[in-house]
């Protein structure tokens, strides 16, 4: 989410009142507009510094004013530094980044509208389609001239592609094939949701020629999918007056647009054929047509969680090496251009593009206007239709907050929050004599919006009885967009809405106990000792995805209040960076006397090369092998393996020469090896060692020389070792890179190996990629992670039985020392929409005839979670009374059951300790003085009253997942395409207890059982006869998690009370440092029934997952602690039952693809 907090300082430069009351139309490059745009741009760089860092590395020729870098690292009033930058320079910088449409435009529009500035270019025309069930608010047609500039990054990458002038002509033909496909495919996802198809399909036109950028402007066809009815106004009018049993599930807007937002970067596949062979480009163009719905995310998706998920994208660049052993010299390098699989797997870039736009505007002008003006049913909110300078008109990019407080005898709280550019969340609370909860949640794109009300709705939240007729209402609801968002919905690009209400108008829980045994002994215990919880949460947007910033909770509470911050470290962890480096060989390398083909090994080392041997001299003289290595930025590394029928020779010396290609983003390195014929053969090379200082143009914000404490350096080394003897093949590579910024030091090393014995058909691989991130902020911490991958797979051709085993183990460790603050709430949203495209090459052999099929498998997985919470509260009060010297104990149990439905959200703590669900246990001990008189004798006793309040929430999650798989099979020369829809309904019930961030008082015991049933309909045709099969896929997943709390207690106070000769000792303890150990075992058994020719076969694919975590919480006065956990270590074993030989191991990478692979049978 873009932090626009600096805009507050910019607005002071403009006229304050006059500019807001009257709408002014200014020239596009007015000085105020420049300053506001630059403030948003600088704030966005701070919030996504590594994303800009990566962008600058791929566009080194771009220049930036030195004032930008100075402003990024100057947290004071930096606005005066930016006054000298021209409007054209501002437009070039801001619109040149790929996330301009999705993130910068809404933020700039919001910032400009707050200053009363609305810019428009009236020459363009557009059509608006608004979907809303409550009111039709027409949005004005505004276009921007600089929205299509997002296509410029494609031209820079493609410039490296053509090695000869002839090859550059062939890719242009592929453009014609991509243009029509975009229109046709855009109709396909219309059924699911509009926002997927729209516009900006221009980015997929990768051809190097600049003319291609003009062809896709006919994106008006994408207006049809505006049927997205994102039922934002699904007002689920759950205004159930009584708070009890209002289990109305807010299943609102599960229409979550499967916003195929993956921006599948398939366009980059056209840059892969760096080896001048043109035949490869034609195949890649067909691949890019499959996910034609790719470019949508650049138009609308307010990819809120893209900051955290972008890091994990590099993990999917795992592997492929695809080359056959055909002894060809030139065509060998073309075969492995199928490495586009690694690029298409970058689907997690927009894994959580929670688009809430309900209105899409497609215009005939070069820019697409997207209006997220969303009409709401609240009459208090005036027009949301206001022209904005950017091409995405957001009527109210900042949520319009209207708080109405009605003062009456029965205090009512009515707060209405409307957010347009984000999921509209309307929360209405009415508090009367009996606290009535009326929660109205309206979610548009996905049920990702969260309304969390930390209010004293529980009738014990009042430490002072306010008896005045006028409600004493504390409503923390500030509308400021500063980084210290206190209880305010600050949602422009991230649909995380949090509302906190604190009110002291709640009734006092009064427990009136009358003993009937003796005359007139009345004990009135009024539980008015519980405090008013008034918490102000101050959060600061993270500077980067590594989350080195730390927030503080400032809480004003009574002595008995506990500000329980919740923690999350399981699923959403932005600092968990997993980089996989897998080596996969698709063919066997045998000994021969021919010049071998090249093998491509893809790792995420940031280096892409293709090596091809060019000459080989006979053994009578010194052997000389020369190879040319072409490097680019596609994160791959390629080496050549030389085979020989005679004893292989080691190279004795090598010369390396490197040169840079200034016209593009690649460099060329040439390596020549010399050897004597008496030694065995091997290849050893060291690649790419570079370092830069703070003035290097390759580093983002390198002009920060004005800041003496800032320094930037990059060091990257890569070594590889390949040896082939006459009987075995062994490959190993290592890569180490590190860079230092003003607040971070990151180092990454990747070590991978591959081995295969020619006498065996089994090859093995292993890789390790440890990562270390050290923070240089005021809270010093070091975070390290390591991913170890290993596996065995068969590489023999023409084998009908294949077994593959893959094991992945990831470990994370966080060490935090001397933090200024311990814990702060941070909202996260758990709703996910992802599109995955996997291209699989299957070789089938029958009767000595082998056929290779290229089967694209597209998986669309849309998830929407609805949580129904049932809360049981049991209050047990024990009162001891002693009338007439006889003591009796009376226990008064009070059970309260509350049920509410809410969209799922996770509250994470800064140290990412644990996931939390709203479960709370309180222990309250009061000391009461009771005077009892009987027969003229009075006795005063100190009676301790212990109240135990145990709350346990049962969360029931119902998840509907629809996976549509397209499979192409060829039999007898006839190919047919099957579309297999798989609908998965998962239901889980989880009962958990709370782990508190501060004191970790409780144990956790969680048991989860989920039953997964998928029913697949497959139609198979053979010889003109079609058969429809109903293939049930059942999966049973049982998870058990236990968390033990070994706690050391520290005595705090000992109190002795004596009365009437009887003494009572009361000891109060404080919880010491706790250590949690969590272990879990999950076994998923998937059974697939396949029927063919009247014979049915059942295949079972077990997946075992074991997790173990050790958690040491950070106390409030933290000195040093360590948090370590190891993520899932899983093993997948699949037997194909003699059907096909899957020669790409990444089929088994995920469970869903494993099921798809079985369905291929």
Curated annotation (Swiss-Prot):
UniProt region (Disordered), positions on chain: 123-309, 326-345, 354-547, 691-713
UniProt cross-references to PROSITE patterns, sorted A to Z: SRP1_TIP1 (PS00724)
Induction, as annotated: Induced during anaerobic growth and completely repressed during aerobic growth.
Chain spans, region 46 X 3 AA tandem repeats of T-[SP]-T: 134-286
GO terms, biological process: fungal-type cell wall organization
Signal peptide residue numbers: 1-19
Keywords: Cell membrane, Cell wall, Glycoprotein, GPI-anchor, Lipoprotein, Membrane, Repeat, Secreted, Signal
Lipid attachment locations (GPI-anchor amidated asparagine): 1137
Propeptide: 1138-1161
Pfam families tied to this protein: SRP1_TIP1
Stored PANTHER family: CELL WALL PROTEIN CWP1-RELATED, SERIPAUPERIN
Function text: Component of the cell wall.
Domain notes: The number of the intragenic tandem repeats varies between different S.cerevisiae strains.
Protein name: Cell wall protein DAN4
Source species of the chain: Saccharomyces cerevisiae (strain ATCC 204508 / S288c) (Baker's yeast)
Taxonomy of the source species: Eukaryota, Fungi, Dikarya, Ascomycota, Saccharomycotina
